Design a protein with these regions (language model features):
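A conserved ligand/cofactor-binding region detector
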Residues: 2-142
């Protein structure tokens, strides 16, 4: 019988798991995270990156921070003997753009604005406005 990931002992964590540029909430950490994603994820240098590139790099940097916290929450949940979860899904609720909400939930709106200012982007709203509404249509049913 093959072993599952939960059976495997001492699985290694990615080397960037605790790096501030991946998980830190400060303006410098976000600046480094955005820089890393511009170059390594998007293949862009700062001097030729478009506003959309900065939107994507900021989104990836925020996702890094959310992912590390999500995994910590899952670990805490698994530590309980009988974990329980409640989920609610409404087909009538449109979630809208998420980057601004995620910045708010992490409490890093000002830090993100400061990080973007270091790239010469004075108004974070210009970057947030680039996010498209999630495609949650009703299939023409109403």
């Amino acid at each position: 019988m093959s072993s599952t990931f939960t059976d495997a002992p001492d699985l290694p964590l990615p080397s960037s798991y605790g790096d501030p540029e991946r998980t830190g909430l400060g303006a410098n950490d976000l600046f480094e995270g955005i820089s890393e994603h511009l170059f390594f994820t998007l293949g862009r240098r700062v001097d030729n990156a478009s506003p959309h590139d900065f939107y994507l790099a900021l989104s990836y940097a925020v996702r890094d921070r959310l992912t590390s916290r999500q995994l910590a929450s899952q670990d805490a949940l698994r530590a309980h003997e009988r974990p329980r979860a409640v989920a609610y899904l409404s087909a009538e609720f449109l979630i809208g753009p998420q980057l601004g909400n995620n910045l708010l939930m992490l409490g890093i709106q000002a830090e993100a604005a400061t990080a973007l200012q270091r790239f010469g982007i004075q108004d974070i709203e210009q970057i947030l406005a680039l996010e498209e509404e999630p495609g949650l249509g009703n299939g023409g049913l109403g």
